[in-house]
Amino acid sequence: MKVLLISPNSLTTPYPVYPLGLDYVADAIRAEHEVRIADINPLGDLEALGRTIERYAPDVVGISLRNIDNTDKLDPSGFMGDYRACVNTVRKHSPAPLVLGGSGFTLFPEEIMTDLRAEYGVVGEGERLGPLLTAIEAGSRDISGIPGILTSEMPHRGVKPLDRTFALNYLCARSQLVYYLKNGGMLNLQTKRGCPFRCIYCTYPRIEGRRLRRVPPEMAAERALRLEEAGAKYFFVTDSAFNADYDHSARVAEAFIKAGVSIPWGAFFAPTTPPDGYYQNLAKAGLSHVEFGTESLSDQMLTVYGKPFRAHHVLKAHEHALAAGLYAAHYFLLGGPGEDEQTVEETLSRISELKKSVFFFFALCVSIRIRRCMIWPLNRVRYNAGRVF
């Protein structure tokens, strides 16, 4: 069958993000089906997408929904309207069944299925699409035995993440990369999936599971080298936390060096205390900056958030990164359950100890006024059985 995979993500702030997930999906089904990717960023608009659909005449159309909103209170924007417009374009130009997927879809599958009225949805990792395509091609209407697949008639059930290592043996066409190489020059790479941490707000475990599935370091290095050869000026490791496994991440860095990767890269890190020399070795491998998921410098709030570290670990991790000559950034999340003036004051008063750093603040709760800070509405938080979603 002819399968068209669409990335409707037009968000370009702070930079356009290459739709890596669709490459994984395309690679998983390419042996059995003809696959094409349509990315709205290089296409430019929905009219161009419509022309692409008519020329290709797909048998199945998949749309990957990456983001639900931009989490920016100063310039808030939701994307469901854009997704509706994308679906309308697909329906206008093709009678093919529509399959929804992606990280944003996985968080709210039933609501989005109802809103966008698709025939099918893929919850979790998109590589699950293969068995669904087989069923569609065979004309089967019974998909109840396919994990992670839902329809508007079949209610969503809990889905376990795929229990296997994901492939890295694809190389996207140069034509797909041109837009991103011209607009920032950054591409992306995964060295593992899953997250073992239990932060109460995080979506990674829900999408990828808690068990780490590691790419062999040599394979990760080969992929990084191919990104460089394709023209990337920089790449970002999209793991939940690159240092969630210190040993594996150190071996990945060693493999980068052996493979001759020469462009800089960055990644997300948990501010836990690293082994001696860890950040120095990563810097030698090209790491230019670390992005710490710190969230708070109040031990009380770190406990509430389910973080595997405390404030003194944050300071120590920051010192190690600076000592290695790296740039550092910290993300903070204000307004979690139990946040009050005292806990915010703890965070704000200790920030000065994080020298030479950039800080990004996000808010969680609704209009809570406290001294020196206003926590505005940003994300809707649902409380259910003591959990935060």
Residue ranges and their predicted role:
Residues M1-L225, E229-A230:
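Acidic, low-complexity intrinsically disordered segments
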Residues T12-T13, N67-K73, P109-E110, F197, ...:
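Flexible glycine/acidic-rich beta-alpha junction loops that bind and position SAM and/or redox cofactors
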Residues V17-Y18, A48-L49, D75, F79-D82, ...:
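Residues at alpha-helix caps and immediate loop-helix transition turns in enzyme cores, especially N-
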Residues I63, V123, V237-D239, F292, ...:
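Conserved beta-strand positions
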Residues E111-P131, K284-H289, E346-F362:
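Structural recognition of alpha->loop->beta junctions
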Residues F166-A329, L334, S349:
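Radical SAM [4Fe-4S] cluster-binding motif and immediate context
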